[in-house]
Amino acid sequence: MGKKRSASSSRWLAEHFKDQFVQKAHKQKLRSRAYFKLDEIQQSDRLFRPGMTVVDLGAAPGGWSQYAVTQIGNQGRIIACDILDMNPIVGVDFLQGDFREVSVLNALLARVGDEMVDVVMSDMAPNFSGMPSVDIPRAMYLVELALDMCRQVLAPKGSFVVKVFQGEGFDDYLRDIRSMFTTVKVRKPEASRDRSREVYIVATGYKG
């Protein structure tokens, strides 16, 4: 006999399937509603151009990579990583592994090679416990790792887009990004649920 769903998980599922962006993604055969978040960011901030090299952290199920491919074209390149498996996308070099592990980081850097990256994007999030005192530090650790990736591979004048959950450490993190990039915006895309703490920091003009 299967486990009975909790009231909160049942509410989440009901909300999820009524979500207009979930429905739209399903109709258009897109990987996830995250596709629309990145599309909105691209419309306002113009991160992608044909021929770019992009690193996608926390890529599965592939919404961001799927969108980025449409912007960078056949001459572009995407190196994606996630702890979860992801169905192949043409033009995306996918590495499955835990980005927190040094061996996975090194494998990712090996795939990037000597070429500098034009955009680093991170949609990483931890498994949430429902306890902000636990969840926020876990989430901040992941976004710090994403920023470290910028320091290692991002080309001068490159861009960074990262999902961040507002809470302890957010202001300090934003301050660090502002010290590293010329222009920094905090975005809340329409496809992001109102009650979610998530926002997207969009940083352009990496100082290198």
UniProtKB/Swiss-Prot annotation:
InterPro entries: RNA_methyltr_RlmE (IPR050082), RNA_MeTrfase_FtsJ_dom (IPR002877), rRNA-MeTfrase_E (IPR015507), rRNA_MeTrfase_gammaproteobac (IPR004512), SAM-dependent_MTases_sf (IPR029063). It is an enzyme of class 2 (transferase). SUPFAM superfamilies: S-adenosyl-L-methionine-dependent methyltransferases (SSF53335). It is found in: Cytoplasm. Its EC number is 2.1.1.166. Pfam families: FtsJ. This is Ribosomal RNA large subunit methyltransferase E. One of its GO terms (cellular component) is cytoplasm. Its main location: cytoplasm. Keywords: Cytoplasm, Methyltransferase, rRNA processing, S-adenosyl-L-methionine, Transferase. One of its GO terms (molecular function) is rRNA (uridine-2'-O-)-methyltransferase activity. Belongs to the class I-like SAM-binding methyltransferase superfamily. RNA methyltransferase RlmE family. The keyword Methyltransferase applies. S-adenosyl-L-methionine binds at residues 62, 64, 82, 98, 123. Specifically methylates the uridine in position 2552 of 23S rRNA at the 2'-O position of the ribose in the fully assembled 50S ribosomal subunit. It catalyses: uridine(2552) in 23S rRNA + S-adenosyl-L-methionine = 2'-O-methyluridine(2552) in 23S rRNA + S-adenosyl-L-homocysteine + H(+). The active site is at 163 (proton acceptor). HAMAP family: RNA_methyltr_E. It comes from Haemophilus ducreyi (strain 35000HP / ATCC 700724).
